Amino acid sequence: MAFLVERCGEMVVSMEMGPHGGGGAAAGKPVPAPFLTKTYQLVDDPCTDHIVSWGEDDTTFVVWRPPEFARDLLPNYFKHNNFSSFVRQLNTYGFRKIVADRWEFANEFFRKGAKHLLAEIHRRKSSQPPPPPMPHQPYHHHHHLNPFSLPPPPPAYHHHHLIQEEPATTAHCTVAGDGGEGGDFLAALSEDNRQLRRRNSLLLSELAHMKKLYNDIIYFLQNHVAPVTTTTTTPSSTAMAAAQHHLPAAASCRLMELDSPDHSPPPPPPKTPATDGGDTVKLFGVSLHGRKKRAHRDDDDGVHDQGSEV
């Protein structure tokens, strides 16, 4: 007796084979996806009703406290603690949000006490199937990819995310336990490729701007800045010629300063009272009373000579 397990989408089917490898008779019941089973256990736990619980009619469930739900409950069932990734997974399985003011979700096969209906919930298929070689290309050539020569990502991977609360860069680590590793890896690779293309375009635009600025500077220097002319005269001769050119003007300025009325002579020495009570003659501020006495002495000598001659 042997068992063969096949994965059909997200549904695991077990078939019993015959003793000789032929097709067995009985086919086992379909098993729901692990994500649905874990979500049902998470919602049905009465100890966490203050965080997540069933709705009023037991056909919906409500996440009352998303921060605590992501921090305390998600790591116990999944390999992440991202509430946005959990919401995206619900969307891929056909869950819809009931009201806009709270996180209440519903699916016609997700009901309290009806765990056997979980096998009827299937993962949504993308509207445009990817090309056949694409699912195997990342695993075979991902070490030789050139980020600047990758083809644009197929549009099929951009239409299956209907609820967007977070960038798609974290999608590759959100559904590690439900069989969607290949699609998530392709989505993450496409997002990285798109970011690289955006950065490349920004760098090219910045390079073009710098080239234009460089050309403008060269044009300005060539058309608005005069070239420096070289002379054969030495700096010493040039300085002497400039000094000779300015020397007469400096001399005239100096003479004007001497002849100007603003230039006052030094103050005269203090006057001494005259002994004979007469006016004294001064020359450059010096009294000449001694010369007057000498003149009187000459007069006396002349009178004396005349008397002797008589």
Swiss-Prot record:
Pfam families: HSF_DNA-bind. One of its GO terms (biological process) is regulation of transcription by RNA polymerase II. GO terms for cellular component: nucleus. Exhibits temperature-dependent phosphorylation. The keyword Transcription applies. Residues 124-147, 257-310 are annotated as: Disordered. A motif (Nuclear localization signal) lies at residues 291-297. It is found in: Nucleus. Its main location: nucleus. Residues 196-225 are annotated as: Hydrophobic repeat HR-A/B. Residues 296-310 have a biased composition (Basic and acidic residues). Keywords: Activator, DNA-binding, Nucleus, Phosphoprotein, Stress response, Transcription, Transcription regulation. Residues 263-272 have a biased composition (Pro residues). GO terms for molecular function: DNA-binding transcription factor activity; identical protein binding; sequence-specific DNA binding. Homotrimer. The hydrophobic-rich region (HR-A/B) corresponds to the oligomerization domain. Belongs to the HSF family. Class B subfamily. Transcriptional activator that specifically binds DNA of heat shock promoter elements (HSE). This is Heat stress transcription factor B-4b. The gene is HSFB4B.
